[in-house]
């Protein structure tokens, strides 16, 4: 009888389950906190909870994750350069560097104008060490992808970093939606690479050299190599797995399923034993894409969502934070700090117009990992990172320790790195 290992790496916890493939009977299960600084720690903790004996008979792994979804919802990911060929991008997904060059094709696939490879080369050389991936999108590239393929090859040769073309992700018309999808995919490539590398490394520690199948956002499976190239297809992977799991556990072929995790709350529908798909492309964070996935409504509200008091208003922010109960068990002095704030803090009388500027006295900062652009930090932010690595601190505490104004610490910018 085949034995399978199911792994789910979420924004808060990593879950592992051993089951008989033919019967669906669960043989063992375990949970461990997801460790974003080093994913392998959380994965290892979950597998240790399963035990070596139970793992020894596993013949395949199914991996689902909300890391891609959470990265998109929270606006995180790697630094991306965008090359637009023949038309500028009019969407709202942010990029770190962008260029628009001559080239592109018409709706019949005929070349509209020659590709300006000289401008492409100048741009690519100007972003060396400034970006981690390149997104390439040409006008009507779904009819003729030659220009996109040329730029992708140049990016890999000059920069030596991952590059992805819009036509590789979507065959649908709609330039801006295709570019948005491509940018998201580029941002997620290092995220997916880290996840697969972490899973593969921990499996080898347990003597397992077996296939890993990654759950797509539509509930089907994809290979490791495909997941590395098209990580955006794993957006809503975790919620899709939840839909299928709920159907299997309840025996219901028609259901509405609500899955609240640490970072997001997801609601999906099962009809006739299958997840209802968003064939026209799903919307993530208010942005239209060409990603075909389960039709799931995702909101940045979860068990770890940041709660802000903005004047008279209570605001749920999509960013994920460490719950105070967890922080208190991990670091000393948290409770005493909260009691001090409760006895002395004065609430804001007027709400701030820019919610990103609101940082409360009860919010302490600790590093999850080093920023991707560590070499570009100014002296104040670099010192701030050193201080909070020693113990969690508020912005005010860190500012006093450094002898600077609190406003000089770029906390919001650092959180996005």
Stretch-by-stretch model annotation:
Residues 1-417:
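N-terminally biased helix-coil "hinge/interface" segments that flank
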């Amino acid at each position: 009888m085949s034995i399978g290992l199911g792994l789910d790496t979420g924004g808060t916890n990593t879950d592992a389950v051993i089951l008989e493939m033919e019967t669906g009977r669960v043989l063992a299960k375990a949970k461990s906190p997801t460790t974003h600084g080093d994913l392998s720690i959380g994965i290892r903790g979950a597998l240790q909870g399963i035990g070596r004996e139970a793992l020894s008979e596993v013949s395949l792994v199914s991996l689902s994750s909300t890391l891609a979804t959470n990265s998109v919802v929270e606006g995180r990911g790697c630094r991306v350069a965008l090359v637009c060929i023949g038309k500028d991008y009019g969407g709202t997904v942010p990029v770190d560097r962008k260029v628009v060059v001559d080239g592109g094709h018409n709706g019949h696939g005929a070349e509209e104008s020659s590709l300006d490879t000289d401008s492409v080369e100048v741009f690519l050389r100007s972003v060396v060490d400034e970006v981690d991936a390149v997104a390439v999108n040409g006008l009507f590239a779904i009819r003729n992808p030659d220009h996109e393929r040329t730029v992708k090859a140049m990016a890999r040769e000059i920069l030596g970093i991952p590059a992805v073309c819009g036509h590789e992700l979507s065959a649908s018309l709609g330039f801006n939606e295709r570019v948005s999808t491509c940018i998201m995919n580029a941002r997620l490539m290092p995220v997916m690479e880290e996840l697969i590398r972490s899973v593969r490394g921990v499996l080898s520690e347990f003597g397992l050299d077996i296939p890993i199948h990654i759950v797509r956002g539509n509930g089907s499976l994809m290979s490791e190599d495909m997941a590395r190239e098209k990580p955006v297809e794993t957006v809503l992977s975790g919620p899709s797995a939840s839909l299928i799991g709920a159907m299997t556990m309840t025996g219901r072929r028609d259901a509405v399923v609500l899955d609240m995790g640490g970072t997001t709350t997801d609601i999906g529908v099962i009809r006739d034993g299958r997840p209802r798909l968003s064939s026209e492309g799903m919307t993530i964070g208010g942005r239209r894409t060409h990603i075909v996935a389960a039709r799931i409504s995702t909101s940045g509200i979860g068990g770890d969502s940041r709660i802000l008091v903005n004047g008279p208003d209570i605001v749920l922010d999509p960013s994920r934070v460490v719950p105070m109960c967890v922080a208190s068990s991990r670091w000393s002095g948290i409770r005493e700090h909260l009691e001090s704030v409760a006895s002395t803090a004065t609430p804001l009388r007027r709400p701030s117009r820019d919610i990103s500027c609101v940082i409360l006295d009860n919010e302490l900062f600790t590093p999850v990992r080093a920023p991707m652009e560590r070499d570009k930090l100014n002296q104040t932010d670099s010192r701030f990172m050193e201080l909070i690595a020693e113990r969690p601190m508020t912005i005010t505490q860190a500012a006093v320790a450094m002898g600077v104004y609190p406003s000089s610490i770029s906390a919001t910018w650092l959180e996005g790195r």
